[in-house]
């Protein structure tokens, strides 16, 4: 999304590549999902299990205007790459963290997958009701898209704020919350009907 707005995005991938590179459907040996999600991005492979990889990632962060990471909350902290490491040395940095279930609470360390979050937030049931009782999972990653829109909006607001104040900031979003907010009218209806 940010590349569409003119950002120069460097995507960091593990040595084996982003797992969505290997998904279907494919056209000319390329995953259509990967291409759609990563069009316009430059890529670099970094082995974050090695100290040299972590330091390379730290140098990339120090040179960035905006960082977006989507690990579980404990991962960047464990690697020493969380916002607190860079807040003082990079005061203009905008650091966005995306997680499945937030930075605290009983589900914070759970991995989030769009089909699971679809079911947890009621989208699967709602779509099944509309389809006359066919509750097959929707193949579209609603949660990924909704969370990307929410995160991009937060980053744009933070960039605007930085222009006014000169200060960067930490922003975060959660896939579960983003997806739930996308259909609050359904949630409200269910609560009012007490289903």
Language-model features and meaning:
Residues 1-164, 170:
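N-terminal helix-loop segment corresponding to the beta1-alpha1 unit
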Residues 21, 169-171, 184, 188:
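Extracytoplasmic/periplasmic beta-strand context in beta-sandwich domains
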Residues 175-195:
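Single conserved hydrophobic/aromatic residue that forms the stacking wall/gate
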